[in-house]
Structures are given as C-alpha cells and as structure tokens.
C-alpha cells in the first residue's frame, strides 16, 4: 500500500514525542510492507525543525535514514495550483494532499486527521492504520 507520511508522524520519531512507538512501527512497515512517500516540502521543514531542537547533523542524519525507505512525491506547478483550490484551511495540509495525489497514495498518515476531512485522499493516524492493517504474524515453525 502506498502511504504519504505527514511531517508530524516523522517528528514523533525524530523528537521522541508522544506517539513515537506507533509512528516508529508504521515507518518500519514502510521499509518492508508498504511504500512510504514524503512531500517534497516536508523534507526541508523536517530538517529545519529537527535542527532547531537538536543539531544540523542529527537533522540531516534523520532525513538520510528516512530516504532509505521513503520516496519523495514528484510535484510541480500544476500540483501547487490544485492545492490552492482544495477546500482546506491550511495550505501546507493542501500541499500534503497534492503530494499524496501525485504519488498515488491510498492514505495520508498524520496526527491531525481532522485537518484532512476535505481531502480526497483519506487520512488516518498511525495507531488507526496499524489497527486496520496489522502486520501479519510470522508463520509458526512446523
């Protein structure tokens, strides 16, 4: 399944915020079972926020570790114009939706589901996604 990961889920893990355990489990699944995608603008914002809390090195190291399993949605002017027309209050959230649409994501994984009520791509928080799509148990040894 293709998932667009909102920056707040990444920050849970990077800054060890509440919800970090579920967010980390979800990100681990992106490396194995699901395709994880990021919006282009999230990469710069993520670096800035981590560097402000920790250091430039830790911000870049975290992004490098994300780019091992995550791809970056390819967006351009038509996507930005489409985001302007979405019935959403927060333009940054509209850009996330445009990125999700550009990469063909089935879900946006976010801590702020309510901000995506008008999104054509459904949004779930990490815990809800993990409940809905649990990781299969390993086969029992015979």
What residue ranges belong to the model's regions?
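A residue-level structural signature of the nucleotidyltransferase/glycosyltransferase Rossmann-like core
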Residues: 2, 35, 72, 108, ...
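Structured helix-beta-strand junction loops
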Residues: 32-33, 69, 86, 119
């Amino acid at each position: 399944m293709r998932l667009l990961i909102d920056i707040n889920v990444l920050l849970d893990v990077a800054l060890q915020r509440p919800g970090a355990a579920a967010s980390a489990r979800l990100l681990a699944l992106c490396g194995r079972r699901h395709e994880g995608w990021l919006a282009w603008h999230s990469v710069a914002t993520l670096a800035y926020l981590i560097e402000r809390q920790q250091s430039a090195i830790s911000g870049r190291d975290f992004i490098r570790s994300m780019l091992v399993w995550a791809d970056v949605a390819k967006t351009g002017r038509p996507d930005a114009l489409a985001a302007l027309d979405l019935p959403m209050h927060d333009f940054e959230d509209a850009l996330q939706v445009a990125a999700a649409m550009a990469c063909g994501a089935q879900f946006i994984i976010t801590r702020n589901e309510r901000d995506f009520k008008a999104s054509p791509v459904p949004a779930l928080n990490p815990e809800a996604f993990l409940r809905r799509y649990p990781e299969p148990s390993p086969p029992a040894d015979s």
